[in-house]
Amino acid sequence: MVGTRCRQAGQSNGVAYDPILPCERDQLTQRYGQGTLTKVAAVYERPFWREQGLTGFAVDTGFPISIAYDDSPPGSRPGVVFGFVGGDNARRYARLSPGGRRSAVIAQLTQYFGPGARHPKDFFETSWSQEEWTRGCPVGIPAVGSFATYGPRLREPVGRLHWAGTETATFWNGYMDGAVSSGERAAAEAIAEL
């Protein structure tokens, strides 16, 4: 048995198949895109927002962050807030310079948590759209109407090729639990063929 890792099950259109996939499976693969998501993190000396009785959690419809969380490790240092920039905001955010992106995030965190947010000791960002093996995040999204036509092929093996990934889950699609259960399903299918 040979296993290989490729992009998410729906997002395998950067992989060359020989022989080529059957028509309906190939059409499904071509019609699965990814969401646009960037993860940002600001690191502070300490989680100062807790001293103000704040949780470090924020939800916003503004720009750029749509949701932020306190991601500080146990204890009192460092303080870490991470957030997600998604959809249209992520595409707009990507057009800014690195300094402009950092400034936009810090300005929004300052609105949430006050002046202590103005001077993080570090700042990180990851654009999942720029990652070779994901090309986006958080989950594969079929084009409008394509799932009704090609969806039945999503979990169907192609010869010895079995599909697994959160997009192929029958429950908890889009979550880690779905990814695990789909991996178990695909493994059981492959074992049954031995």
Regions found by a protein language model. Give the residues of each.
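Central helical "cap/lid" subdomain
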Residues: 1-52, 116
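Conserved flavin/dinucleotide-binding core of flavoenzymes
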Residues: 14, 31, 36, 51-194
